[in-house]
């Protein structure tokens, strides 16, 4: 099986999408003849491997020009991508992407025996109605569609009125390289890893901290507009004393920190049009490293977190529900909490990046 994973963005950026793509591709490259197709740009592969704890090889990456002189364009990228498509040695290759416009280009330019596989993580049309026809065409005509949760696949079927028969769910993955670690859980503070954008749910965490007088230790980028907005908000609400900024951790250090963490890990989130699609990557990372997670009860999240079994759920966007569930968790014994965290750890053993790649390969073999 020959596979080209098309990712038309420069790396590394460190966002969740990139983490998922690089880890998935790396595991796929260990199982089949796979190439990661990237825009041509300076790339320190050793740095990328160190940052993401990977072992990507230089000959697994194909660079495609996206820039000529001072002109940078996706059309340039597509022009050179077409050379890969038209190469006769790739006449029966599989082209895999999460990028909507790349998927459209592949469908329009592929050879008869080539296959186009699209991985869906959202409904792009929710943010841009002009994409409706393109997105429907891709979901209808792609040779196979993967979705990162059942809720997303079902919502896309309903939204576009499609069956999407050639499809499967492959949940996001995680690294799980250490044994389960029993912990002495502490409720005096809460660690938070991720974006400092208030609208993504951090605002809910601030309300929770103000109400409970609990300290927050925030791991994230200590610069930029979102950081400054957060700093100003803390000052306005007079809760600066409750928040400690710990800085941005490299991805390989995040896992170490999560293994050592002994606080309840809350995923703050508010309801939006995207609530039926989103499963945060951090959810998998938290659960894979012996933690107790308190997450919003969105349908995609509830596919992973079974309330009271391998984690806990609260009513999304409801500060009162969050506080009540947190207070309930505090009543549990340390032994009971370790049982919950062990269940979380064990449930993630099925969702390693390697197992994700195995599931993808199994489905692709059916169409190859």
Please state what every model-predicted region is.
Residues 307-308, 312-319, 328-334:
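Conserved acidic donor-binding segment of nucleotide-sugar-dependent glycosyltransferases
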Residues 7-14, 27-76, 152-153, 157, ...:
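N-terminal strand-loop element at the rim of the active site
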Residues 23-26, 82-89, 104, 118, ...:
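Membrane-proximal helix-turn-helix segments that form the acceptor-binding/catalytic region
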Residues 105-106, 136-166, 174-178, 360:
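A short, active-site helix/loop in glycosyltransferases that binds the activated sugar's phosphate group
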Residues 220, 228-257:
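Nucleotide-activated donor-binding/catalytic signature segment of Leloir-type glycosyltransferases, i.e.
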Residues 328, 335-350:
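A short, well-ordered alpha-helix in the C-terminal region of glycosyltransferases
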Residues 200, 251-285, 295-303:
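Nucleotide-sugar-dependent
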Residues 4-6, 146, 181-217:
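Conserved donor-binding/catalytic core segment of Leloir-type glycosyltransferases
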